[in-house]
Amino acid sequence: MRSTKVFLCLLMVLGVCGQAQQSSSQVSKQSQPMPTEKRIVIAASTVLDGRGRVLRNTRIVIEGSKIAAIDSKAGPVDYDLRGLTVLPGWIDAHVHITWSFGKDGKNAGSGETTQDAAYRAAANAWATLMAGFTTVQSVGSPTDVPLRGAIAKGLLPGPRILTAVEPLTGRGERTGTPDEIREFVRKQKAAGADLIKIFASQSIRQGGAITLSPEQLNAACDEAKKQGLRTLVHAYKDAVRVATRAGCTEIEHGTMATDDDLKLMAEMGTFLDPQAGLVIENYLLNKDKYLGTPGYTEEGFAAMEKVLSLNHQLVQRASKVPGLKIVFGTDAVAGAHGRNAEEFIDRVRDGGIDPMAAMVSANSLGAEAMGLANQIGSIAVGLEADIIALDGDPLKDIAAVRRVVVVMKGGVVYKNAARR
């Protein structure tokens, strides 16, 4: 019922967005969608193809929503992006797109109105798209579903959304028997889930202890596979090994995983999505807005400060494990939407990740983890025309990720602030 109300409220947002575009030439210039059937040619001097290669002095031809050709002689040129760095739209594997601060400035909870929830969700989606993220995985809330639908139908501008709907929260035996967990997975599939999010550990604010048995995790991951769904498991410490052995798709966080755990993940083809900084930095920056709301205490904030260096060390260790697939996810919550790219800087500066590897983690590797490698994540013929341009070269200066000047998703230009 709440999701239905939010969807109706999202429709109301459209009228406000329309009025804003009419009253602001800057907004209309950057957000006015282009006809999707028009043939578009982009000229670029530097293209990161999303797979680890750099293309020089080429042109990208778009027809409808897809990349039709990469041809240095194509013309006429519609967008001259020479002097910028062109690359695929980024993919964030872990966000909470509907989280926001309420009217009182605090982390919004169940007391917010559906109207407020809808407005803020739409604003979060817009901020995320403008930051260069054309696909996100929101894990999860039932409110994700109407937002996903509104964006997919073109009613609202925002990134492509994949959602877990409701997560499976580990509470030991109270979580349910293996059969009950299987039923939970089937229920999420029926509700429209693209994946299953599983909490196999407490929050790091509560110590990060394991909360599900091997039998429970085996049931969840096995049933998800039967339903054609991927599994993302929030796991710390021992839960990393248990979830990996259960056959999950991706480990979220992974703090305090051992080197043997990381090697096991590489052997089993399990993706790792660590967070090097943004999520904790955002919590600390907005401490007054979270403190006192459910799950946020002084002790919890002290715990987060202590593990920040452990997160840096995890990224450093993981990057040295042959064959381990590290994807890009931010765990963006209230206060972080639109600042997702800061995680790139944290990973390169504090985690020692190679800048090209950082870009690939949010492009082709992120698409592979989502099972969408044949649709998004690369500048390649036949894939969706999700294309962004940066003022600067992130391979030389990772801070260039803050300077997104062009955003195209599915062949539609939503932002064009490139110098002319």
Task: Give the residues covered by each predicted segment.
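Bacterial N-terminal signal peptides
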Residues: 7-18
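Metal-associated gating/positioning segment near the N- to mid-region
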Residues: 84-153, 215, 238, 243-246
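Histidine/acidic-residue-rich catalytic or RNA/ligand-binding cores of hydrolases
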Residues: 101-104, 148-149, 240-247, 278-292, ...
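Divalent metal-dependent hydrolysis catalytic cores, especially in the metallo-beta-lactamase
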Residues: 118-144, 158-169, 191-203, 230, ...
